[in-house]
Amino acid sequence: MQVAQGALRQGALYDLLDREQPETDLRTATVNALMQRFAVDTAHAERVAATACALFRQAAAPGSERAERKLEWAAKLHEVGCRISHSDYHRHGAYILDNTDAAGFALPELHRLGILVLGQRGKVRKLEADLSDASFALQLICLRLAVALCHARRAPDITEMQLLMEPGTFTLKIPSRWPQAFPQSAHLLQEEMVAWQKTPWELRVQAD
């Protein structure tokens, strides 16, 4: 009996191809299982994920589908730590993702999701070492904006919002009437602008 190396290589190739197809990617099923295991509010998780991904698509370069899917997973798992504590749920969520058995995920992938979950709130400077990666910075700001915009646990209307990305700068364009219509959300956006100060990136909110 001889080992058929060619067949193994072909099989591995098919596994890799399946892994990058949303319909057959085991990681999607794993994320759903983690949501169920830690009693995540599915409706809110999907609301935040949809908002984050919509903003991401506005600013991302063509061919960023993989980064968008990872953002979607991080958004769906952003409250996974609430099962442990509501006060520091972002920290607990990051710990869970760093220490869980998640089929289909490589350890660096899980760590990256954990970093996004950790960075969803609080100071951005704690992740400064990761912010040199423009794709990661975009994922992070989209997640943070989505969490802020969905603070009332309702789907925000972002149809007239536009997120732009330039070297070192993010610009969120909002309708001129929006701050008056949604004062709490406008306040959270102001806080978000402050959070990005003293980092390699600047967030501007522009009312047109």
How should these model regions be labeled?
Residues 5, 75, 121, 174-176, ...:
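Active-site proximal loops enriched in glycine and acidic residues that flank catalytic Cys/His/Asp
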Residues 2-23, 181:
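Hydrophobic/aromatic-enriched cytosolic interaction surfaces used to assemble or bind macromolecules
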